[in-house]
Regions:
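Conserved beta-propeller blade repeats
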Residues: 45-60, 86-101, 136-154, 180-198, ...
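Hydrophobic packing within well-folded, soluble alpha/beta domains
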Residues: 120, 142, 148-151, 163-168, ...
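Asp-box/WD-like beta-propeller blade repeats and closely related beta-sheet repeat scaffolds
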Residues: 85-91, 95, 104-145
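A detector of repeated loop/turn-to-beta-strand junctions in beta-rich toroidal repeat architectures
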Residues: 25-27, 117-119, 160-162, 204-206, ...
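Beta-strand C-termini and the immediately following turn/loop, strongest in propeller blades
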Residues: 20-22, 42, 54-65, 102-114, ...
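Multi-bladed beta-propeller domains
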Residues: 30-47, 72-88, 123-138, 167-182, ...
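Ankyrin-repeat and related helical/solenoid repeat scaffolds used for protein-protein interactions
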Residues: 218, 229-286
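Bacterial Sec-dependent N-terminal signal peptides
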Residues: 1-22
Length: 304
């Protein structure tokens, strides 16, 4: 939720209003990447976004600025205590050891964020008061290094959206990409050697990867879809990403025809993981693989 932020924020408010009237239904779903079988975990009357999958078999999702857990056995949705962070967006993720949660939130009491700009925080996985990490705004969290030491994120600095890195403890951020056009959704590979991301540098939104220091960028997709948010599997064998079936330029909108696609990282072959469905913003913004690399969580929608 970062490109054309003012537009996205207005749009978010409009979808919130719709959902408050019961017009939006969010379907939290799981797909098996081997069999293709899909299971609807929960149908929620309202807007839910961006599932993470914890190794203890529950999901973490966003809904209207708050975070919730969804137990995959009981399918119960429970509010997560995020302290003073009450305006979270859909860029959040779980630390490699499963003990911490990174979140992106707008602090209404912080005068530096009066334009509704996002800050990255870290908090205990079971809830608590978040600790601020990024000094500059806006910053949108997407990746956590396998050694647990570094966060990577999309950030707007001087009008350019690029990939940045910062120590988990905070400090000075490092710019990783410098090309024109949006670079978004950065995530580390399981071995920490690569960063996968989506970029408009070619004039079309595609999936790319680079070495962790930003060198040797490599384009991975070449079709006519608008391809967003590559999520490397824990076993480092594949990536899943979301494809808009139409050219959306640099926009990542809700309410579009999309599908999930799977790329084999050894052969670079790509196949559809799901049929086309109604989704987009909120569907799979953040990593949502199960620990065994067999399943993925995502959200599809219906607006009445």
């Amino acid at each position: 939720m970062k490109l054309l932020y003012i537009f996205s924020f207005i749009f978010f408010l409009s979808t919130q209003a719709l959902a408050g009237q019961g017009d939006t239904t969010s379907y939290i779903q799981v797909v098996d990447v081997y069999s293709g079988k899909m299971d609807t975990i929960l149908a929620f009357k309202g807007h839910v976004e961006a599932p993470n999958w914890h190794r203890d078999n529950y999901l973490i999702v966003n809904s209207y600025g708050k975070l919730y857990t969804i137990d995959l056995k009981s399918r119960k949705m429970t509010l997560l205590n995020t302290g003073t962070a009450q305006s979270c967006n859909n860029d959040h993720l779980i630390s490699p050891d499963g003990k911490w949660l990174g979140i992106s939130n707008t602090d209404a009491n912080d005068t530096s964020t009066k334009l509704n700009k996002s800050i990255i925080y870290i908090m205990p996985i079971n809830g608590g008061q978040p600790r601020r990490v990024t000094p500059s705004i806006p910053s949108y969290l997407h990746g956590w290094s396998p050694d647990g030491k570094t966060l990577i994120y999309c950030a707007e600095r001087n009008g350019d959206y690029d990939v940045y890195a910062i120590p988990v403890e905070g400090g000075t951020e490092k710019r990783i990409t410098t090309t024109e056009g949006l670079d978004d959704g950065p995530e580390y590979s399981a071995d920490g050697k690569h960063i996968y991301f989506n970029s408009y540098r070619s004039g079309h939104m595609h999936i790319w990867r680079m070495l962790a220091d930003g060198s040797q960028p490599e384009q991975l997709t070449f079709d006519e879809n608008s391809n967003w948010f590559a999520h490397p599997s824990p076993n480092n064998q594949s990536i899943v990403y979301m494809a808009y079936t139409s050219d959306e330029k640099q926009q990542h909108l809700f309410g579009k025809d999309v599908k999930l696609r799977l790329m084999d990282l050894k052969t670079k072959k790509i196949r559809d993981l799901t049929p086309v469905f109604f989704g987009g913003q909120g569907t799979i913004n953040v990593p949502s693989w199960s620990a065994d690399s067999r399943k993925l969580a995502f959200v599809s929608y219906k607006v009445n």
